[in-house]
């Protein structure tokens, strides 16, 4: 096999503190290219072409690189997607196969966090041609890109990278041949095929209607303003005159839990708050309920309502006026005497610290009087007020019939969501949409430990974190074709089906074959109403509860009817419960879990805890389901890409989000696209058997919908 090792150097643009090195930015340029044929132990000769550099007059021809790419059997890079997209944008044709040494390093990490740069990977594999260049790193930090660096430094650096990449590949081959790594050889080919699919959708991009996005922004902002006004009214009623910042963790602890820290240091020590040398969060200590209550009382104190009175020292102005002094001599002695001439600037009042008021305690307990449930709720500012914690606190407030707390917590949860929507999605899409009107997402194969795709980085936004249905921002994603249709095909209940598949749960399989709506069943229990009265929104909300038992959730701390759901789930789906026990026992023995697709996860220091579970239990039970689900979705993407090329369609594959594939569909190709997506996604079982030697027993079902944009969708029959 003729393997061409390649590395491209490009310019980058820094926009609002973000690095944009996308080939879709018309201001970015490919500075130079370096490539060579892989020999027995390295790349013996590295060729180069310079196309855009301040010290280089002219532009080298591309003929030799074009010919080498056409004659190569495989192109080898580190972070191949980046180089591949630049080559495609420049009009080159890729070889039949691509290979990414970063993907292999990611797979060899087996779910553990480790640096994946070429430099770190080469050090790890003891590559001889690695050239560490502090000069290059320093110039990057100073905002100097490759077109402005000394050309001889760039050439030396890039040529060494080409050789290091080739040698890294050669070092990886024998590691993959080791017995305990054999299964990874099944994953590697389809991850590289998936890489080409990602190149396709990223280069295609999605058409954005910025006017619609602006309307959504105004709607979000108007709702946010109303929420903030009402939340501040509630705060004033439960806290008195004390000023509260809704974005402050310490202030939210005061409002929600009615407590504040006595000593931050003592609080951190008591609840083991912080990180270890590896940067991982420390594990909270085990405490009985009474011990936890005592610890809360020792490290925090009750907050009282306050009344504001005018500061007597500054008359409520928050500052005092000082006057200049002059020196006088009287009877031979010097005296400093205040004059009537004031200083230009007033001085902050020390008594009220510039506020203009002094807050006096009324002796009445303030806040919503919620209770933290365990040491896991402790945080550096007092107690947690994150999204998941607030969900639990809402249930607690409902049990206590604390209507004010329910309203506040529900509204603060929505306010936080709106802030995320405005900052991450609306602003992110506005920033990332090119002058062409297209947003080009960036998908990452080597970030999520599970094997799931992530998105983001550079000018891209995290599409994986958006709400799945009914999210108004989706309305701005439209078709590039006149009268075109945005089609989305989504796997139905994939994670539940995957859990039933991996556990071979007989009841789960029977429910799937009978078409039982698991999420509706869950919603019926959670909402405490008959299944036929469950609304679509209630069913969607209940999905989170359905998935929790799949990943080892116990329902502890939940209301009795929800806790009963967890117990009932494990009683009904005994196969899943037994599989969970098997996973934990197996991980205790050898530290590794493997999926049918060959993906592996490694936990080296797992141990059994006092309550009978094992450490890392959530990951041990979650990763196999997430990983195999991800691999099934990626196989579907590969199949869709293959079928699209065969059909030579004008329609464009645009996104894969969660368990779905999105297509910007030409008006003349709707039926073809629906047919291709159905074949690609429901036929994944055949592909899995061919690639992995594994036969699926659980059928996969999809829902296909279409409409003028990503929000307004009608399900096809």
Residue ranges, per PLM feature:
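Conserved "right-hand" nucleotidyltransferase catalytic core of DNA-directed polymerases
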Residues: 1-18, 25-27, 32-35, 44, ...
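Short active-site loop/helix that positions an aromatic residue
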Residues: 81-92, 105-109, 253-261, 492-507, ...
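Conserved catalytic core of nucleic-acid polymerases
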Residues: 196-199, 203, 306-349, 357-358, ...
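Active-site-proximal helix-loop-helix substrate-binding element of RNase H-like nuclease domains
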Residues: 25-28, 35, 39-178, 275, ...
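Conserved catalytic palm subdomain of right-hand nucleotidyl-transferase polymerases, strongest
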Residues: 77-78, 98-102, 479-494, 557-561
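Function-dense linear segments that define catalytic or interfacial modules
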Residues: 442-530
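A common structural junction motif
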Residues: 678-690
């Amino acid at each position: 096999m003729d393997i061409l090792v390649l590395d491209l150097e490009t310019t980058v643009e820094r926009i609002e503190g973000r690095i944009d090195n996308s080939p879709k930015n018309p201001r970015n340029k490919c500075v130079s290219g370096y490539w060579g044929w892989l020999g027995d132990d390295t790349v013996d000769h590295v060729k180069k072409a310079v196309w855009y550099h301040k010290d280089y007059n002219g532009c080298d021809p591309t003929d030799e690189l074009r010919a080498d790419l056409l004659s190569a059997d495989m192109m080898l890079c580190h972070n191949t997607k980046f180089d591949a997209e630049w080559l495609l944008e420049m009009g080159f044709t890729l070889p039949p196969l691509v290979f990414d040494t970063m993907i292999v390093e990611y797979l060899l990490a087996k779910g553990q966090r480790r640096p994946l740069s070429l430099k770190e990977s080469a050090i790890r594999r003891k590559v001889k041609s690695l050239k560490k260049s502090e000069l290059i790193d320093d110039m990057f930090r100073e905002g100097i890109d490759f077109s402005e660096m000394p050309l001889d430094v760039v050439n030396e650096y890039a040529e060494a990278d080409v050789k290091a990449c080739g040698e890294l590949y050669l070092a990886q081959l024998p590691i993959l041949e080791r017995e305990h790594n054999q299964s990874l050889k099944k994953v590697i080919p389809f991850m590289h095929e998936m890489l080409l699919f990602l190149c396709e959708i990223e280069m295609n991009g999605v058409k954005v209607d910025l006017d619609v996005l602006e309307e959504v922004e105004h709607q979000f902002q108007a709702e946010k303003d109303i929420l903030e006004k009402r939340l501040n009214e509630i705060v004033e009623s439960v806290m008195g005159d004390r000023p509260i910042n809704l974005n402050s963790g310490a202030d939210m602890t005061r409002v929600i839990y009615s407590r504040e820290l006595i000593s931050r240091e003592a609080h951190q020590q008591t609840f083991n708050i912080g990180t270890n040398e590896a940067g991982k969060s420390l594990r909270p200590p085990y405490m009985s309920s009474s011990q936890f209550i005592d610890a809360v009382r020792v490290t925090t104190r009750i907050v009282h309502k306050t009344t504001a009175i005018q500061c007597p020292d500054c008359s409520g102005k928050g500052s005092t006026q000082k006057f200049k002094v002059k020196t006088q001599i009287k009877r031979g002695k010097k005296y400093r005497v205040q004059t009537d001439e004031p200083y230009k600037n007033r001085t902050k009042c020390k008594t009220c610290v510039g506020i203009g008021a002094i807050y006096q305690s009324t002796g009445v307990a303030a806040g919503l009087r919620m209770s933290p449930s365990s040491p896991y709720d402790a945080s550096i500012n007092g107690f947690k007020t994150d999204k998941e914690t607030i969900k639990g606190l809402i249930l607690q407030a409902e049990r206590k019939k604390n209507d004010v707390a329910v309203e506040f917590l529900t509204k603060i949860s929505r306010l936080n969501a709106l802030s995320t929507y405005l900052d991450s999605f609306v602003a992110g899409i506005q920033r990332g949409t090119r002058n062409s009107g297209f947003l080009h997402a960036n998908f990452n194969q080597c970030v999520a430990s599970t094997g799931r795709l992530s998105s983001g980085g550079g000018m891209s936004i995290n599409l994986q974190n958006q709400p799945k249905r009914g999210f108004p921002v989706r309305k701005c994603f439209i078709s590039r074709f006149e009268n075109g249709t945005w089609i989305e095909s989504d796997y139905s209940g994939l994670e539940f089906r995957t859990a039933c598949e991996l556990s071979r749960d007989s009841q789960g399989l029977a429910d799937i074959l009978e078409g039982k709506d698991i999420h509706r069943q869950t919603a019926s229990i959670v909402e405490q109403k008959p299944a036929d009265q469950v609304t679509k929104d209630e069913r969607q909300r209940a999905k989170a509860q359905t998935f929790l038992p799949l990943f080892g959730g116990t329902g502890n701390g939940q209301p009795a009817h929800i806790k009963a759901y967890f117990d009932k789930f494990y009683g009904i789906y005994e196969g899943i419960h037994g599989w969970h026990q098997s996973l934990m026992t197996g991980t205790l023995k050898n530290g590794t879990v493997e999926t049918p697709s060959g993906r592996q996860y490694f936990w080296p220091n797992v141990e059994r805890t006092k309550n009978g579970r094992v450490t890392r239990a959530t990951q041990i039970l979650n990763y196999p389901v997430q990983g195999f689900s991800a691999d099934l979705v990626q196989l579907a993407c590969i199949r869709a890409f293959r079928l699209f090329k065969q059909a030579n369609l004008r329609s464009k594959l645009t996104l894969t989000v969660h368990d779905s594939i999105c297509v910007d569909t030409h008006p003349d190709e709707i039926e073809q696209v629906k047919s291709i997506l159905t074949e690609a996604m429901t036929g994944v079982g055949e592909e899995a058997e061919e690639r992995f030697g594994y036969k699926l027993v659980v059928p996969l079902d999809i829902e296909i919908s279409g409409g003028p944009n990503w929000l307004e969708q009608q399900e096809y029959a």
